[in-house]
Amino acid sequence: ALSFDYPNPKIEAEILINETGIQTDIAQKLVTIGTKIRNLTELGLTETVSTRLLIDAAKLIHNGLPKRLAVHVAVVEPLTDEQETIQALKDLCDLMI
């Protein structure tokens, strides 16, 4: 069986920059958000933040969507339908972006 892990933060930020043209500081913040959510076992998420979700958020930001809204739509909402969890993740992301 093959086992895949997430790229280290520096490489993941470079992926976001190369795929979307996003600014380095924003790419780094998105990677930090992704890493933080991946490590939140308390929320019991069945899915977590993939590099693809971060790329989606970066594309939205690069195309002019406000950063917080882009993270909410592309990163937070695909992870769960539970309103309390969504709000907790939005609050976390708002502090980090």
Regions inferred by a protein language model and the residue ranges of each:
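C-terminal regulatory/interaction module of P-loop NTP-utilizing enzymes
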Residues: 1-97
